[in-house]
Each structure stands twice: as C-alpha cells, then as structure tokens.
C-alpha cells in the first residue's frame, strides 16, 4: 500500500515479491462491495498424491482426438469437492490427507469494453498455482489470506477452464511450519470470485478516526493506476460529510476532516456508518465504524475510557462437522456462543479468519485480535520465511484495515527469545506499521516463571519493549503446578504496560465427572476447579487488562494422542465438540458478567 511511508512500503513490497512464492497482485479493498461473479460451488477434483499432475500437464485438460490418443487423467465423472470448504471433511479418504489436490471448473465471463477482470481467492490452504485455459497465471503461499490475479486479457466469453493446484504439505520453511496444534485442513477454503472493475478503479482506501481525536477522520484513497487530477468524493451521508479530493500523479489522495455528532463504535453500541468513495468511473460503499484506541501506561483506552478485555479465542472450525468454518452461518454460530459467554473481544486464533467472521464480529460489538500463524517452531533465520511472514501480515492488514473492530495485530505465539527471532518479529511490526499505525501491536509469550527468591511470577523477554500490549499464555494447574496457593500468587510482568492473559485453562471431556483435584481425571470438575484457581490469581496481577481463556470449542488436533479422553481432539474448550457447555463455561460467564 502506498499510504504511510511510501518509500519504505515499496521496499517491503519488493522484498516480499523477491522471496515469497507469490505472483498475485495488490489486493482490491472491499471485494464484497464490488461487482462480482461467484465461482463457488461444485468443482471437479483429482488427488495428486505422488505429485504427477504438473508433470503430466493435467491443467491442459486434454481429450482424446484420434483412435490412438489417450490420457491417464480426467476431471470428468470423478471426485467433486465443494468450494468453499476443506477437502478433509468432504471425503473419508481425505480426512488426514496432506499433499496435492487439483481443483477444476468451467465458467463463462461477461467481458465488457473498458472493464477489467480479476480472479479473487479468499484463501487457499496452503500453496496454490492457478491455471486459466491451459496457462499458469499465478501462484500464492499462505493458507489464510486472500490473493487476486488479473485475467482481463486471458478470459474468453464462454467455456473458460480454470484449474488450481492446491498443496497443504507441511514444510520447515512454511508458516506455520512442521508442527502446530490444530488440524491441517487443505483446499479452497474461502470464496472464489471473478471481480469486474472499471479500467481505472478505486483500488484501495482507508477511512478511520484519528488515533486520539474523536472528531477528526483521516482518509486516504489510491487508484489502480497513477492518474493525476482525478476527482474523488468521500461521503458519509448520515454525518453530512461530502469531501472532495484530487489525486496526485501517482493516483493517490488524502484528507483529514472534522465530524460533528459522531457516535463512536463500541462493544455496547457497535454503530456503523455508510461510507461512499466515488470517482468519475467507479463507486464503492461499505459500512464503517469509528472509534479511538490507544494504550497509555498500564491501560488500554477505547474512546478515551479504560477498557477490560473480556475475551475468548476460537479456531476457524465447526467442530460438529469436523471442518473449516467458511460461511456467514458458521460465523453466526461461533460469534453467538462468544456473545452468550459475555465477551467483548475475540482472539482469532492463530491466523486471519474468514472475512464473514471479521465483519459480523464488528456488527455484533466484538473487538478483535488478529494474527498470522507464527506459532512456536518457526525458522527465524531463514530470509525466505521472514519474507513470507511479511507478505502474510501485509495481506491480513490490507484486507481488514477498515474494520474498526480490529484492535490488535498479533505477530507471534509462544516463540523462544533469540536475536534472529527478535529481528524477525521487529520486521513484522515494521511491515504492519507501513500499512497501518492505528492498531495496538501484541504477541503472546509463554515464558513466565516463578522466582522463588522474590516469590513472584516474572518474565525475561526483551521483545516486550517493542509491543503496545503484552500477552501471556500460562496454564497454571495444567502444564504448570502451583508453587503456592493461587490467591497468594503475585505477578511482576511487563511493568508499565497493559497485560492480557491470552491463554489459560485445561482439558476436560464433556460429561466426565470426577475429583476436582486430580489432573488425570480429565473431568469437568477438575477443569472448573482449575478455572477458579486462575481467577483467584488474576486479582494479584496489577496491570491485568484482559483475559482470554483457551478456548471456546474443543478442536481437532493431531497433537492429542489419548485414545479415550482426546482421540485427536484438544479438549480445552469451554464447549464440547458437540456443542455442550462444560462447567467452566458457567464460571467464565459469571466472571465476565461481574466486570463492568
């Protein structure tokens, strides 16, 4: 993006393209507000377990023409897969499959003079190569962020053949890498659109309140081409705003303007305004909220008032069907359960989730923490891995920067201190801030230890100085024994900064009752007791400004081996995989309801 620190942004973009496995183009902001043709539905598929598809050029989709012609592949009359969705939940044989699957479909395209066409993928997990009418047109790496490819001069009016090679193989240089505590879903997991735009269109924009000023909106607009002296209008009809801008020779324009009687967005009152951005040839509108957010001392301020974050985490998974969440209905289910718990914030773990979830969360009044999957064992010394991470975080921020609910950008989870790690994460923060400086930067750490001499919980990690808000994952009573009574446990961590307990809890199999002091019982009673103890300890953390139990629902994980109590599921959920609330759920609901 060309808004903040243009020269630095260009350097970051070039370095990302040099090192990342991606040939996709700059993202169109607010694709859901554009003229789109859906390519969702049933796609033909071929499982390519031994990686022969590209070698055999199956993307050409050739058919026998003569008596001696034959091909050892065909997309016809074979496996059908739904898009969007993961492949794991659609076929028993693909449940644990890791490798390549080819997706294919035909479509017609309405080509119009003076219009451009883009293929847009909401997400493909994890690597993808895209072929149109027998030609490779782009590739992308990263399973949770969108990408697009211009196809204006490549599509035909009728009978276009689109093939996508999808590969979810884990590798040491990937993000996440070889081992991670969730299911490795593969497939075209989010919407696929053919997007139509004018020749010169409104490619990108950013409209938000100034970080500290409650009556000043900052707006920036970027056209798709460097067209000078183009008139741009920004309108907010409900506020009587009608701002006129003129682009420079790079097609860029910005303005700051005052607003009167603005109702700021908050969890209690998630007000959104219709915002219209228009040029002579293009017009985009969407609902945008306005709020102030900043950290000062040990507090987090929302609309100039301290806020306590009553949070929860969830994966992008519907446990009842053992598959990825991909629809607005899925988002409603997940967010409704978080609302019933009394939450005002969601940590979208551990990766950017579906845009349906982000937009609906904003409407329902949830603040959001969004992160990329820098999860534990990443190759921090690998330059290519670093650039991949930079591309991912940039794609995440570009997609969601106009969502006022987005409050925190997360750069890592449970990483070990080292100089390569520090440089890697600092690069991610710089990449993030080159696009957006209005959110709070955070990361989750798990190295809090008990200092016997001081009788305090402490943490030694120099990187916390780079963050606006420090987050701690600590599983007292589960992975860590209590060194003293919970009510006597005091903390001295990240002094002078706001602190969030970003993960705590333990596992319980729904309906399993037993001793509340025996960890190996895997019982709801022990899980509830563990929660009580942690809530007692939280009273002794002076800079605690939020809690986020791990996790809302039980979720699938190959990490979890116990045959009777886990069976491939992480059972830390407050709600079971069948949707039943455990005893600890009621404890957290009461805890949150008593915080005003």
Model regions: which residues?
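Accessory carbohydrate-binding/adhesion or oligomerization-edge regions at the termini
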Residues: 24-89, 161-165, 171, 532-535
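N-terminal carbohydrate-binding accessory modules
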Residues: 29-34, 205-208, 264, 278-339, ...
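Surface beta-strand/loop "capping" patches
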Residues: 199-226, 592, 596
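Bacterial Sec-dependent N-terminal signal peptides
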Residues: 1-27
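Accessory beta-strand-rich segments of carbohydrate-active enzymes
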Residues: 29-30, 46-50, 93-201, 226, ...
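Short strand-turn-strand beta-turns centered on an Asx-Gly dipeptide
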Residues: 131-137, 237, 280-281, 303
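Extended acidic/polar, glycine-enriched regions
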Residues: 155-159, 222-296
